[in-house]
């Protein structure tokens, strides 16, 4: 009897050890898969858009890639300058007191310089940075409150200073010049907004908060007025989804932000997550959320991409260099989408000499 009990005990121990080993191996595989996506993301929550700061102790201060412009003094930027005047964009960046030095200052040193006007929105005012104090609390549950108050502030103080109003996070990188091309085809008095379009929960879809989204002037008017008339309320702490529901209620169209050949321009992750096949497992929420069929690999992203998300300070400068400085010698751009005729005509009037005439458009 004693030997049988001892045998049962040994079987139990062996079974427990094997079970523990298999569970630990499975957990390790799952954790590695999650870490491969983004170590600092809340992976199972498509609306968790702010990553934790990685420290980046080597990044002591902000850099200015445009300080030494001697290499680019003869660069022809007539088109970009004309669009800067014709398509005026106010950018507001959602940040927090603890992220001014870790994140927001790198946005300020890079892409934000190309907005016609930029504002940093925080829970507290900081006159040195500076930030607009929205007098809210911090935390994920406050994101929609901050968004509502930020758009109200922009509407009350800067409505006539821009045509379009872009919201971005402090870990979003935006190629503002490409955004201007996208918006140049539209009238800011049209009730419409653009971003990375997701499909669940809202009939017309809604725009991913992390990839950023941009409202027309009329969309901004309607959004602010909807809270005055109580057509919309603070119905959820999930900022992008709640804003999307409000937009549908007030008949603001969810626009198609893809380029002329159907490639996406707004991206909710860093480039590598979209460009490398298999980086995002098929069980990941992303594949079920896209309004348009998503593509992975080199075909994922437009040549005139507008935004990427979860971009840390170091990567901000890497993207700034790759987008605005690195050039392959001897190549002309293969994909040059057309400009609206009225803008193209004005540019060519400025460039009267035949050798400097700008020819833009698909062949």
From Swiss-Prot:
> What name has this protein been given in UniProt?
Glycoprotein-N-acetylgalactosamine 3-beta-galactosyltransferase 1
Residues engaged in binding a glycoprotein: 285
Q: How does it assemble?
A: Homodimer; disulfide-linked. Interacts with the C1GALT1C1 chaperone; required for galactosyltransferase activity.
What Pfam family is a match for this entry?
Fringe
Q: Which gene is the coding source of this polypeptide chain?
A: C1galt1
Where in the cell?
Membrane
Residue positions binding UDP = 94, 138-140, 146, 169, 309-310
Q: Which family does it belong to?
A: Belongs to the glycosyltransferase 31 family. Beta3-Gal-T subfamily.
Per UniProt, the enzyme's principal EC class comes to transferase
What does the protein in this record do?
Glycosyltransferase that generates the core 1 O-glycan Gal-beta1-3GalNAc-alpha1-Ser/Thr (T antigen), which is a precursor for many extended O-glycans in glycoproteins. Plays a central role in many processes, such as angiogenesis, thrombopoiesis and kidney homeostasis development.
What does the record say about the knockout? Mice develop brain hemorrhage that cause death at 14 dpc during development. They express the nonsialylated Tn antigen and brains form a chaotic microvascular network with distorted capillary lumens and defective association of endothelial cells with pericytes and extracellular matrix.
């Amino acid at each position: 009897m004693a030997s049988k009990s001892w045998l049962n005990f040994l079987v139990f121990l062996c079974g427990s050890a094997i079970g523990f080993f298999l569970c630990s191996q499975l957990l390790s595989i799952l954790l590695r898969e999650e870490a491969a996506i983004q170590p600092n993301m809340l992976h199972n929550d498509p609306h968790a858009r702010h990553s934790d700061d990685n420290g980046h102790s080597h990044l002591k201060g902000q850099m200015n890639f445009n300080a030494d412009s001697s290499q680019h003094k003869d660069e022809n930027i007539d088109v970009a300058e004309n669009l800067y005047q014709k398509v005026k964009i106010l950018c507001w960046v959602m940040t927090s007191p603890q992220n001014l030095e870790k994140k927001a200052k790198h946005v300020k040193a890079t892409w934000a310089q190309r907005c016609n006007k930029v504002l940093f929105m925080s829970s507290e005012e900081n006159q040195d940075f500076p930030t607009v104090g929205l007098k809210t609390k911090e935390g994920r549950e406050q994101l929609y409150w901050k968004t509502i108050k930020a758009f109200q502030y922009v509407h009350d103080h800067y409505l006539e200073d821009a045509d379009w109003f872009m919201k971005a996070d402090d870990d979003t990188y935006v190629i503002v010049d490409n955004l201007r091309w996208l918006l140049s085809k539209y009238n800011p008095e049209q009730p419409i907004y653009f971003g990375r379009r997701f499909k669940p929960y809202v009939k017309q879809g809604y725009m991913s908060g992390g990839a950023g989204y941009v409202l027309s002037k009329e969309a901004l008017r309607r959004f602010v007025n909807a809270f005055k008339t109580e057509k919309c309320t603070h119905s959820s702490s999930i900022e992008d989804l709640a804003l999307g529901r409000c937009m549908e209620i007030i008949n603001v169209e969810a626009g198609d932000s893809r380029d002329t050949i159907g490639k996406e321009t707004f991206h909710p992750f860093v480039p590598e997550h979209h460009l490398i096949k298999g980086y995002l497992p098929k069980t990941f929420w992303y594949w079920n959320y896209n309004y348009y069929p998503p593509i992975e690999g080199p075909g994922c992203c437009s040549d005139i991409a507008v935004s990427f998300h979860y971009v840390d300070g170091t990567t901000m400068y890497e993207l700034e260099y790759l987008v605005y400085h690195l050039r392959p010698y001897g190549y002309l751009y293969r994909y040059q989408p057309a400009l609206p005729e009225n803008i193209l005509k004005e540019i060519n009037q400025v460039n009267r000499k035949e050798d400097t005439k700008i020819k833009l458009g698909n062949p």
